[in-house]
UniProtKB/Swiss-Prot annotation:
Record-listed E.C. numbers: 2.1.3.2
Pathway noted in the entry: Pyrimidine metabolism; UMP biosynthesis via de novo pathway; (S)-dihydroorotate from bicarbonate: step 2/3
Function: Catalyzes the condensation of carbamoyl phosphate and aspartate to form carbamoyl aspartate and inorganic phosphate, the committed step in the de novo pyrimidine nucleotide biosynthesis pathway.
Domain of life: Bacteria
Protein's name according to its UniProt entry: Aspartate carbamoyltransferase catalytic subunit
Chain sites annotated for binding carbamoyl phosphate: 55-56, 105, 133, 136, 261-262
A Pfam match: OTCace_N
Catalytic activity: carbamoyl phosphate + L-aspartate = N-carbamoyl-L-aspartate + phosphate + H(+)
Coiled-coil intervals: none
The entry's keywords: Pyrimidine biosynthesis, Transferase
Amino acid sequence: MKHLTGLCNCSAATIATLLELASDYKKELLKSNPQFQPTLCNKRIALVFFENSTRTRFSFELAARHLGASTLNFAAAASSVSKGETLSDTIKNLEAMQVDGFVLRHPSSGAANFITTITSRPVVNAGDGANEHPTQALLDLFTLQEHFGRLKGIRIIIIGDVLHSRVARSNIYGLLSVGAEVGLCSPVTLMPPDADQLGITMFTNLEDALAWADAAMVLRLQLERAAGGYLPSLEEYSVYYGLTDERLDRIQKNLLVLHPGPINREIEISNNVADRIQPPGYSKSMLLEQVTNGVAVRMAVLHTLLAENGK
């Protein structure tokens, strides 16, 4: 694997290898004084973020440091991009500084694939427009596998703005690749038109979707969707598609709850559900576990691309 720009063409075997390595890294991360082999010692990784990020950027930075690499943090607003420099020129200039790899977040779909055509360095897609966010999907798969002990055959319902979600797209590709069953639940205005061609079960009623699923992945609702005419109002969306205690308690099953963050509390998910770590009821929030797993998964990705490819 030279780059990780998406999961659309990522094999089940590749996913399994990355998750196995992530599992080893997580065991060490959870120790009071974790010690890692510095497999990326003297490597320089450019974190090129054209959009804001908390979890993804910081976890990539931690992942790189755990493996002995140094990071260059690029912020578009404080760079020559603000003076009109193109993405292509930015990447070429960083490569000329002998950067060993790129982690890119960009608002344009296809940006990560584009820069693989202009650099010989490994590229990791940290989210490009509405296209893909592969490391988020990998950490979601890792979280599910840790809990269920497998991925094949489990049912995951993805709830919310599937149409515009790069997280949903990468998860759909990854989950189908490993043999999981995928369901989508959203208003028809936020459902991708090609979903029925992928062998996906579609729902418009949230209660039916939750009853079908083993795990629920709640997507962040981009608040501008109401203003854009995709929704009558945020309040109505919350009434019909918000994940609440009452909805989870009615299905009376051990449902796992995931969310990629950031959260719009009391819109797509209630405070109680988001924070339900050890519940008295039937469901469990994995939101913070996902964040922990993100560091281990991104360590696995960086090691695979920069250490193994450099042998």
